[in-house]
């Protein structure tokens, strides 16, 4: 590996102690879809892809998004990652990364009003510009179920050997739709004030932590600025 000048970032390649575990350095490979998720031998291919990144020096890898609920599965998509055989398949990925000296988190992604199927839900029935389907406004019971889905899904990730999960709360997907006033026009406990709009992601994180325990990484990904009218402001994000 060629020598890299890290003078501006002297701690970049130092270990990071998380209390219950440590990362070999502070290099994180952010979540991205690789195109390998839905092809034959996908788990073996993802294992090889991510293991090579770990061997190359990445301390913590975050996978592309996996969906925790039927309400966000596109038409024709594979079944949810909740069956024992799927847990076993994902262990192929985590084992390969661990053998290469890295750690890996799985991103949990609910696409909300971006989901390309007719039974999609959102905080408010506002159609996404990129989708022909109009979402149904989620009921209180549906909101509670989606929170539970995130928590349940995190257990399957833990069983598959992942070191943690990343909860996708940015870029216009379901969690971000609750946080932003532009897409959340509710007047109940899940909408209106910022404290109400942020309730959904906070409850998700709390429930996930309750299910997985303290010795499991939880990353929460949020948009720093939505850069659209009615999106989250800098002041809200700082809160």
Question: What do the PLM-derived regions correspond to, one by one?
Answer:
Residues 1-239:
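Flavin-dependent oxidoreductase catalytic cores
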């Amino acid at each position: 590996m060629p020598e890299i000048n890290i003078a501006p970032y002297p701690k970049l390649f130092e270990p990071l102690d998380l209390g219950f575990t440590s990362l070999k350095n502070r290099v994180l490979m952010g979540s991205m879809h690789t195109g390998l998720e839905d092809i034959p031998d996908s788990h073996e291919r993802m294992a090889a892809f991510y293991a090579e990144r770990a061997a190359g020096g990445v301390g913590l890898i975050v996978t592309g998004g996996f969906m925790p609920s039927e309400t966000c599965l596109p038409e024709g998509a594979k079944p949810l990652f909740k069956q024992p055989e799927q847990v076993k398949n994902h262990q192929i990925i985590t084992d390969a990364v661990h053998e290469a000296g890295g750690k890996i988190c799985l991103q949990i992604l609910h696409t909300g009003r971006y989901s390309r199927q007719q039974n999609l839900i959102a905080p408010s029935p506002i159609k996404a510009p990129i989708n022909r389907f109009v979402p149904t406004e989620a009921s209180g019971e549906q909101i509670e179920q989606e929170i539970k889905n995130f928590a349940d899904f995190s257990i399957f990730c833990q069983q598959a050997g992942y070191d943690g999960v990343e909860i996708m709360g940015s870029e216009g997907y379901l969690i971000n739709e609750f946080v932003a006033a532009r897409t959340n026009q509710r007047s109940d406990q899940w909408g209106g004030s910022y404290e109400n709009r942020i309730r959904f992601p906070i409850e998700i994180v709390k429930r996930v932590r309750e299910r997985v325990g303290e010795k499991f990484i939880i990353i929460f990904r949020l948009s720093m600025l939505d850069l659209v009218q009615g999106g989250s402001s800098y002041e809200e994000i700082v809160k």
